[in-house]
Amino acid sequence: VPQAKSNKLQVRLVDGKGNVCGETSLTVSSRQWKTYKAVITAKATADTHLEIIPQSVGELNLDMISLFPQNTFKGRKNGLRKDLAQVLADIHPRFIRFPGGCVAHGDGLKNIYQWKNTVGPLEARKAQRNLWGYHQSMGLGYFEYFQFCEDIGAEPLPVLAAGVPCQNSACHGDLRGGQQGGIPMSEMGAYIQDILDLIEWANGDAKKTKWGKVRAEAGHPKPFNLKYIGIGNEDLITDIFEERFTMIFNAIKEKYPEMIVVGTVGPFNEGTDYVEGWKLADKLGIPMVDEHYYQTP
């Protein structure tokens, strides 16, 4: 706060007619990054927007602004919106796939979903855009996902890129073709370790393992008992894909032989990728594959 010892912010909810439906204030006094929290109690039910108004002269840097309900599903900290989560719970799904789709393998190598950026303090998580063109705050990260699965009795099925990004990377508008590419072989060891670290984070002992301790510090000392892990999403079954998928698959089976790896057989339930995907599955002995059907029942 360069020009003031402290700076008060008015924080309020305002409807389309300019009526204030709830407000509070925050006093910012630190010159360092710091988390500030306050509670707004709504005085009406309305379609509103959030306003943050400085009350003194100065300069402020704001980051990770979040308006979040106190009453979450199962009362979980940073949990899911209660009504939407209940809809999912009422379906009684046997598993939940996350983050799923092209979000998992991303728009190019630098956009591949990194699970480690989604755990830990909310304000420290690394946000990024996704292939669909919108922003991910990572507020719903792997911890919240695993916790939700546990709360509704569903098996978690995390999906990680198979060392390649989406083949539609860099496609815009009606342009098609894209590029698949692949993580450089010199970096595959580190990428595979990230995947193994996820399994340790989910299932590792809270006192004996590095990532099990991270999970415990987030509020879940007991393992999540992860049984399934998806590798790849609707990928073209190319030499680039096969080489990297095989490396990942073998590494998982060596360290965690009990883990059920779910493979991919291309974006459709027919065609070259489907056929080649099944050939690879048979060759490696992949226990389960994820077929995708874009058809009406």
PLM region spans:
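A conserved hydrophobic secondary-structure block that centers on an alpha-helix together
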Residues: 74, 146, 151-188, 198, ...
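An acidic- and aromatic-residue-enriched active-site/binding cleft used to recognize and process polar
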Residues: 4, 14-16, 55-57, 67-70, ...
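Extended acidic/polar, glycine-enriched regions
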Residues: 1-90
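Short, well-ordered coil/turn segments that N-cap beta-strands
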Residues: 45-48, 57, 92-94, 152-156, ...
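Active-site neighborhood of glycoside hydrolase catalytic domains
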Residues: 190-197, 201-297
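Carboxylate/His-rich catalytic cores and anion/metal-binding grooves
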Residues: 85-104, 182, 186-203, 283
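Aromatic- and acidic-residue-enriched carbohydrate-binding clefts of CAZyme catalytic domains
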Residues: 104-142, 169-193, 204, 210-231
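Active-site-adjacent substrate/metal-binding segments within catalytic domains
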Residues: 10-12, 60-161, 210
